[in-house]
From Swiss-Prot:
Residues 718-748 form a coiled coil. Keywords: ATP-binding, Coiled coil, Microtubule, Motor protein, Nucleotide-binding. Residues 885-924, 944-1007 are annotated as: Disordered. CDD domains: CH_AtKIN14-like (cd21203), KISc_C_terminal (cd01366). This is Kinesin-like protein KIN-14F. The gene is KIN14F. Belongs to the TRAFAC class myosin-kinesin ATPase superfamily. Kinesin family. KIN-14 subfamily. Residues 390-715 form the Kinesin motor domain. PROSITE patterns: CH, KINESIN_MOTOR_2. GO terms for molecular function: ATP binding; microtubule binding; microtubule motor activity. The lineage of its organism: Eukaryota, Viridiplantae, Streptophyta, Embryophyta, Tracheophyta.
Amino acid sequence: MAEAAALFSLSAAAVVEDVLRQHGCRLSDRDLASRRAEEAAARRNEAAGWLRRTVGAVAARDLPEEPSEEEFRLGLRNGQILCGALNRVHPGAVPKACAHVVFVNLIRSRCAVCHCSVMVVVNTAADSVLQPDGAALSAFQYFENVRNFLVAAQEIGLPCFEASDLEQGGKSARVVNCVLALKSYGDWKQCGGTGPWKYGGNLKPSASGKSFVRKNSEPFRRCQSMNEGEVPYEEAGFSGDYHLDSGDMSTSRPLKMLVSAVLSDKRPDEVPQVKAALKNGTDGTKSFSKSKMDTIEVYSKHRQTKKEAYGEVTLKQYSMLQLQSKHVEELKADIRATKAGMEFMQMKYSEDINILGRHLFSLAHAASGYHIVLEENRKLYNQVQDLKGSIRVYCRVRPFLPGQVSSCAVGSIDEGNITIITPSKSGKEGRKTFSFNKVFGPSATQDEVFLDTQPLIRSVLDGYNVCIFAYGQTGSGKTYTMSGPKNMTEQTQGVNYRALSDLFKLAEQRKGAFIYDIAVQMIEIYNEQVRDLLVNDGLNKRLEIRNNSQNGLNVPDASLVCVASTMDVMELMNVGQKNRAVGATALNDRSSRSHSCLTVHVQGRDLTSGTILRGCMHLVDLAGSERVDKSEVTGERLKEAQHINKSLSALGDVIASLAQKSAHVPYRNSKLTQLLQDSLGGQAKTLMFVHISPESDALGESISTLKFAERVSTVELGAARLNKESGEVKELKEQIARLKSSLAMKDSGSEQNINRDPEAFNMKMPSPGFSNRRQGSCELVSSQTNFRQPMEDVGNIEVRANPTLRQKKPSFDLQDLLASNDSPSWPDSISRANFQMGEERVTIGGEWIDKVVVNNNNSVGDWEGDSAALPDFFYQRYHSGTRDKQYLRNNSRKKDGNEFEQQRPRFYSTNTDDSDDIDIATSDSSESDALWQFNVQSINSSISENGSKIKKPQTKLRESSDTRTPLHSQIPSASRKTSNGNRSGRQPLSGSDSRRLSSNGRHAGTK
């Protein structure tokens, strides 16, 4: 029994040594261990997945898809899944029947030497029992299935594992390696099995001595066939002397197995030594055991040292973990406090936002009210401007040109103020501020500029005259504002294009209530010559300006073209821009060398009431003032610059006279001022764009331009007139004109009726085009060829001959005075007011009224005899085909201003306040006609005493054959008019005539 104990002790020592050898080479690197654990888990999952797919989910119900090491071991412990997988890969490799059942008990015991856990195999024989289907398998069936699998796998050449690897504490890595090798073998067979098969996995050979039972050892095979408790020690190398009783060994079967396992690793020549050591207890065995014990002791000490070091590290890590846990708790507390603070701040922010929202709402409400008040103030301001007739002045600053580097002379720009930086003599920077209605900076767009002028432009459709002109030095952007650049786009279109487009849009919106006819003219003033820009030969044709034209045609001979859309306007304006005089100077490569004027005539008719509205809009692009030393012009360009500067100087004189409210305004000093006379004289709403350059080099010109614009803004022209005529008045005037025309035709052949009814000569045959102005595509074009008709107080409207309405005013017609039985005698002197009324009547009456006055005076010549017949040439004058031509030539005569100033003192007792009316009156009627109206009054006062004086001019008339109109020669003291081509000059009164008027003492006076 003692020998058996010694054998067990030796075997236990060998086992402990093997265990130490196994565990001594572990790596201390935890990261490497975790990485290997992850790799092992991945391989295990791959093997489990393949097994489930191979044998089916039902057969592999005990094996999860991603099992742990313990689940993997328990799932494969019965061997059914392994055998099933092997039979699927290699059919018939594992038989299903078992010959007998052997219970194998693996008992875990503790080693007495090192107290480590060891596995002891205990075999117990039992009768052969067949388990029914579905019943739990016995331990023998588990072992038998595993053994059959291992045998078949070894025959195939697969890497095998030990049966103990499937028990608790076994190595599942070798099982996984075997399963993956089987998977690779199955894939090789499915591919055809061509070529040698070799598993490419990580094959680790099993170390000897690590298990109690070896698959190739003879004791393992004998253990399977044992059915009795007796062990064949002879085969194990033991002699017959060392024989244990079966009764004794039956109680220590695990010891047998352990001894067999130990001796199985020994070579045959070592077995006798082991037996001798066990039997005799020799010193060699003791020394061997002692060395083993020393090794174990050293290992134990080393392990204890490592354990202590690990304990210190663990303690340190634990303290650090505690500290970190404390910090985490503190952070959690801070987070909770921060969260509470954020919630409080969010609540406060919500309250503040609500308060700000209420304040913002109140501010928005106040702002909306402010904008409403501002809009009302703007409307009221515009109404005040309209009532005062002030010229609106808008200032625009041109941006710097590309590539231009210069200091800016513009300091600041506000809503209506602009500040210019001016250097002073002391070297300090000075500033001058100018105020206008609106100031546009360099960044202002064309659309912004037009939006402020849009209400003014739209008033044209309401029957008002509008004038917009651009002023400034050359190169300051006048043409850009009015027309646009050379390569024009929709965004860069100027005021001209936008104004006409807006008129068409508004006319389209009002088409249900009004019908509008729109026509345009485009002229230029080049070197004091008026030229038509809408015709190809307009450069060679000279046009005349007639300011008293009642239909807005100040240049009646210019082309008047009807337009119906914006495209028509653009085509016409392109033609006009091509024909305009443009040249290159040192200041501007496209310098305008002329003043251009685009005139838009609008006539509208109210479909409900029949009211006629007429409006006229002048869009004037003035040529820029320039200094010859800067523009470096010579030759023809120099001549152009001189004419431009002269006309702009005349415009400045007119503005100065208007600002000072002078009695005389020199409109006729230039063609430009003569063209703008109606607009500057209070007949229209006027707007001036003043342009300046931002460069410091142009500081002098900019300040001069701004000063001129300030003077313009102070001019008050009076309220603009509304050109409106009701339908009833129009019908009555047409009816009166027709009645007078028919009466004149009936009485023209009766001398007696003419003498009794001189009013018959106050009638003029209406022009066919005038009586039917709606014929043709455009009413305004047809009216261009007609004679201008008289104009009443309603403004520039179409008026038929209506002397009945004129009777509402004090009449100074000689026949009207004589027709009244109880009329008072003619006063010796005429008051200033009555004279102005008479002069207004002459002006408003138009061309044919002047002729009627002369006609009435002819009857005065024969006043002594009521039945006296008039000469034949009198009737020929009013019924000849050349009557209108003579009258037009009469209207186009040039009048010398100095002669008029010399002759006016003879007929005015006092100076008149409105010299413009005199200019208008003398522009279309001959001076002798104006003189005749007052000479007739003088004759009327002394007709009974000086009858011979009336007949004397008639004798002169018969003797003179070069006079234009015979009737004018009957005027007692009128100046003689001689014909000189298309121009006629006035001759001063002869000395006898002057003395004759002075002797009467009626109208002589000094200026």
